[in-house]
Amino acid sequence: MERSDQPPDVVIRRLPLYARSLRYLLEEGIHSVSSQELGERINVTAAQIRKDLSYFGEFGKQGIGYDVEKLLHHIERILGLNQHWPVVLVGIGLLGQAIARYEGFRSEGIEIVALFDSDPAKIGQRVGDLVIQDFANVRRVVAEKQVKLAIIAVPALQAQRVADVLIEAGVRAILSYAPMILQVPEDVWVRYIDPVAVLQSMTYYLAREQQH
């Protein structure tokens, strides 16, 4: 969802890419970078980078570029990555288990703190350091741990019901792997990851190549 007093959604989506590239630069021992050099790393024009950053203030100096560490700090603050974000994960099938085991979240200030499923055969099983809980307990856990973020990895037919319960419990942002569009209030953000839809969009280009 996008609000009139916010930068365009596409700008927000690029900020994590900028942050990741800046971290790589620091790891390489590079402490100053131009818009052109940063843009080449993520296939974005220098003008676009300057425009994106201008929504949030003045960064860098003409002819000198950006201080990598300072710019990274500013972007992390803009994204709220200077604080801890607890996340609940609902749906612990093969995909959910892979997400639960992914180690890249914690280094970015994001931590999966609870796993939920409605399958009695899965409840009580351990995935990494966490035990799968009954989805019936999700309201209590969301309240206790002050969770605002959730990941949904359930079948499409269950996704809306799961989202409704999470939102009623206090969740305000959902990352959904379910192949359906969720109906949510205006003050709730939803992002979708649908590998099938992405692959189908890519087959369009492959099919066009075959026609020529």
From Swiss-Prot:
DNA-binding positions: 17-56
Entry keyword set: Cytoplasm, DNA-binding, NAD, Repressor, Transcription, Transcription regulation
InterPro entries assigned to the protein according to its UniProt record, in alphabetical order: CoA-bd, NAD(P)-bd_dom_sf, Rex_DNA-bd_C_dom, Tscrpt_rep_Rex, WH-like_DNA-bd_sf, WH_DNA-bd_sf
A GO CC term assigned to this protein in UniProt: cytoplasm
HAMAP family on file: Rex
Function (record text): Modulates transcription in response to changes in cellular NADH/NAD(+) redox state.
Name the record gives this protein: Redox-sensing transcriptional repressor Rex
The species this protein was found in: Chloroflexus aggregans (strain MD-66 / DSM 9485)
Gene that encodes the chain: rex
